[in-house]
């Protein structure tokens, strides 16, 4: 409640003042965080050094959220903006990042505490030490030592994942009224989930709308609302978006060309190990439904045709295939976060099932194919 009251008044223009003595630059960038995990940021404003400081005058539409401030969109540090005037002072700078001391924003204190808790409680120091040993062994090409370190590391990573989720959940509950809670939910929970049915989409929408008013003013909330609309378009029961590409002979092939059949649509590429591990199960499915209106369509995001064709021949995956054109947004339209991603489309072109793997590639179509 105290934090909520501190962030309640955000409709005015706010100011970021930065003193970066020791940083060799005459310009700083304010960036929207596209992905903290991948380090992807998009510049939305810049400030020039004047009288020993940089000043950002934020517009009212700048939503409360985590931002990135640095001498480039890829070299800087994270700062929470919450509508308050804040002052940044250079704390430390390395080749990888910039550390800012932040004054005027209570959320930054909470965010810094979260980062420290996350590092400490998920064995950060131990994992860093093991990683250093692993890279040294790799430089020596000592495969035996690399394997030993990898085996020693796995329990820390496995337990670390569990501890991270518990810590994230606790911070979300404590900060549901402010942008930090909803940012943590978006970046560390929502982006790792899938919503294959309209019921799950509705439940998710109700949950994110249970966050406080300040949280719902953040860009994280807006991104989730937008994503849920996209999920509705590719939910089970909806018509599968069209897929267009070139087959192995260079001819155009469309998903709609297979209308009238039950189609397992397999999104994959040649360098995806887990994708190619599904090939035996796909072969079994093709054999199981032989003579029936059943097809498999491989949809590849490969960029090199030879690698794609070689993988098809090496694996013996002799069914319909197409390779997407560069820049095709079909993965986005199907709400795919990772591959392999296999769905079942009915004869009428509607999605019947999603996220199929292994034995499900036979068991699920078996419920429909007659």
Residue ranges of model-derived segments:
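Sec-dependent bacterial lipoprotein signal peptides
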Residues: 1-7
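A non-transmembrane, solvent-exposed segment enriched in polar/low-complexity residues
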Residues: 9-166
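Short solvent-exposed coil/turn linkers within tandem alpha-helical repeat scaffolds
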Residues: 174, 178, 213-222
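Amphipathic alpha-helical repeat scaffolds of TPR domains
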Residues: 176-191
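N-terminal "domain-start" segment that seeds a small globular fold
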Residues: 222-256, 363-366
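Conserved redox-active cysteine motifs that mediate thiol-disulfide chemistry
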Residues: 259-260, 267-284
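Structural microenvironment flanking redox-active thiols in thiol-disulfide oxidoreductases
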Residues: 276-315, 325-332, 363
């Amino acid at each position: 409640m105290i934090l909520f009251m501190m962030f309640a008044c955000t409709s005015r223009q706010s100011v970021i003042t930065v003193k970066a003595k020791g940083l060799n630059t005459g310009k700083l960038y304010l960036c929207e965080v596209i992905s903290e995990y991948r380090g992807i940021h998009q510049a939305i404003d810049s400030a020039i050094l004047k009288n020993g400081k940089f000043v950002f005058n934020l517009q009212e539409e700048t939503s409360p959220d985590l931002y990135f401030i640095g001498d480039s969109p890829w070299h800087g540090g994270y700062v929470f903006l919450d509508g308050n005037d804040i002052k940044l002072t250079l704390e430390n700078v390395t080749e990888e990042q910039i550390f800012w001391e932040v004054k005027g924003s209570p959320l930054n204190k909470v965010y810094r505490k979260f980062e420290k808790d996350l590092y400490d409680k998920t064995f950060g120091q131990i994992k860093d030490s093991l990683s250093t040993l692993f890279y040294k062994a790799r430089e020596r090409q000592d495969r035996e030592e690399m394997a030993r370190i990898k085996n020693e590391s796995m329990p820390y990573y496995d337990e670390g994942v569990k501890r991270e989720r518990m810590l994230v959940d606790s911070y979300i509950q404590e900060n549901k009224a402010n942008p930090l809670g909803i940012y943590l939910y978006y970046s560390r929970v929502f982006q790792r989930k899938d919503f294959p049915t309209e019921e799950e989409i509705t439940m998710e929408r109700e949950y994110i709308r249970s966050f406080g008013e300040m949280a719902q003013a953040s860009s994280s909330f807006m991104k989730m609302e937008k994503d849920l609309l996209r999920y509705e378009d590719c939910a089970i029961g909806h018509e599968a978006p069209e897929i267009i590409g070139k087959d192995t002979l260079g001819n155009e092939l469309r998903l709609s060309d297979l209308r009238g059949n039950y189609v397992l649509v397999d999104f994959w590429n040649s360098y995806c190990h887990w994708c190619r591990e599904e090939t035996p199960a796909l072969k079994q499915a093709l054999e199981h439904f032989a003579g029936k209106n059943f097809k498999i369509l491989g949809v590849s995001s490969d960029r090199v045709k030879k690698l794609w064709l070689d993988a098809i021949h090496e694996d013996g995956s002799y069914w319909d295939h197409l390779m997407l054109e560069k820049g095709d947004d079909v993965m986005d339209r199907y709400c795919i976060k990772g591959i392999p991603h296999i769905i079942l489309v009915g004869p009428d072109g509607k999605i019947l099932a999603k996220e199929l793997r292994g034995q499900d590639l036979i068991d699920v179509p078996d419920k429909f194919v007659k």
